[in-house]
């Protein structure tokens, strides 16, 4: 009898202890599919979900390089490793010391040279509406302003928007306090700043003004706006360049002590001399980077500069690759080329814009715009 009770107790114990094990096994089996679903929904940084639910890679098209420019915070927007726009804060940097990761501009080196280690990569910002949510107190942050434009550009390329829908027009004058450029640094004068708008399908992409300019600025907002637009048209979809700015009002030739610098003008009307020949480029692995040019400034391969045998230093010329129609405005700051049959030696950055890196040389048309 006792032995029968003992076996009964053992059987009940096995039954009770075995039940949780089965429960755990069933729970594990039920959880596994949920884990698989979560894994399939995960998207890595730099990738996005397509409309079919397939995961596709979104290459890094834009990058933002923060730096200091004239004592102010700045950020240069690169598209496909080519500098396009520079955003500058309206207020000077509080500290005079150069921060870690910032580039000073006291040695003649262009401050927007691409440094991939210190650049902010903008591969995919997801929902563009989220990128527009910004604190008003941060609107002066050049990196945030550049990031918003970069997000829009990435979205345009993702949506296969036609680049010929990128246009530029005159927006009008904006009354703003601009620090005087005279030696009296404490004074400020009320000036009307010209503004231009770059649009895509009649929606503003970016405004060109005193604090948002072409990366290699021509010191003329009209020229900056037109060149930035044409650079965007080419880099987004290889569209042909525009010849002039829309809605540009007629201006009287006099009313300013420096009308060339202050009044917008059509680039074509400022051509003083033109000629053709073969262009080459330098600064790519040849040891010239950082060395003094004929003007004494240090050579920056990514700056929009060029060498010519006789044009005065500081002269700006528009160089057009006659093979593909691409053009760029460069500043003469060096002497050369000294190879027979070549008329101009471009920086690596300018050559990249013209699409002649692979060939090394290209037939070009050169138009002298003045200084």
Swiss-Prot record:
<feature type="region of interest" description="Disordered">
    <location>
        <begin position="177"/>
        <end position="196"/>
    </location>
</feature>
<dbReference type="GO" id="GO:0008932">
    <property type="term" value="F:lytic endotransglycosylase activity"/>
</dbReference>
<dbReference type="GO" id="GO:0000270">
    <property type="term" value="P:peptidoglycan metabolic process"/>
</dbReference>
<comment type="function">
    <text>Lytic transglycosylase with a strong preference for naked glycan strands that lack stem peptides.</text>
</comment>
<dbReference type="InterPro" id="IPR034718">
    <property type="entry name" value="RlpA"/>
</dbReference>
<dbReference type="InterPro" id="IPR036908">
    <property type="entry name" value="RlpA-like_sf"/>
</dbReference>
<dbReference type="GO" id="GO:0071555">
    <property type="term" value="P:cell wall organization"/>
</dbReference>
<protein>
    <recommendedName>
        <fullName>Probable endolytic peptidoglycan transglycosylase RlpA</fullName>
        <ecNumber>4.2.2.-</ecNumber>
    </recommendedName>
</protein>
<dbReference type="InterPro" id="IPR012997">
    <property type="entry name" value="RplA"/>
</dbReference>
<keyword id="KW-0961">Cell wall biogenesis/degradation</keyword>
<keyword id="KW-0732">Signal</keyword>
<comment type="similarity">
    <text>Belongs to the RlpA family.</text>
</comment>
<feature type="compositionally biased region" description="Low complexity">
    <location>
        <begin position="177"/>
        <end position="191"/>
    </location>
</feature>
<dbReference type="InterPro" id="IPR009009">
    <property type="entry name" value="RlpA-like_DPBB"/>
</dbReference>
<feature type="signal peptide">
    <location>
        <begin position="1"/>
        <end position="25"/>
    </location>
</feature>
<keyword id="KW-0456">Lyase</keyword>
<dbReference type="Pfam" id="PF03330">
    <property type="entry name" value="DPBB_1"/>
</dbReference>
